[in-house]
From Swiss-Prot:
GO CC annotation: photosystem I reaction center; plasma membrane-derived thylakoid membrane
The protein, known as: Photosystem I reaction center subunit IV
Record lineage: Bacteria, Bacillati, Cyanobacteriota, Cyanophyceae, Synechococcales
Any Gene Ontology biological process: photosynthesis
HAMAP family linked to this entry: PSI_PsaE
Organism: Prochlorococcus marinus subsp. pastoris (strain CCMP1986 / NIES-2087 / MED4)
Topology of the protein relative to the lipid bilayer: Peripheral membrane protein
Function (record text): Stabilizes the interaction between PsaC and the PSI core, assists the docking of the ferredoxin to PSI and interacts with ferredoxin-NADP oxidoreductase.
Length: 69
């Protein structure tokens, strides 16, 4: 399962805010780190600063936690 930059992927990490959501791979690190895929999503998570709109729309995942959409 070779995931590369620009691929649309579905998140399979159950504890993730974006579980079963589809995102676009922003980058893939090949240096051997565990969570080597940066995935960008359309919606933001709940981690915005109090009183402001917004939050994070990217997260790192291992390739084993993703499947191509």
């Amino acid at each position: 399962m070779a995931i590369s930059r620009g691929d649309l992927v579905r998140v399979k990490r159950p504890e993730s805010y974006w579980y079963n959501e589809i995102g676009k791979v922003a980058s893939v690190d090949t240096t051997g780190i565990k969570y080597n895929c940066v995935v960008r999503f359309e919606k933001v998570n709940y981690a915005g600063i109090s009183g402001t709109e917004g939050g994070a729309n990217t997260n790192n995942f291992a390739e084993s936690e993703l499947e191509k959409a």
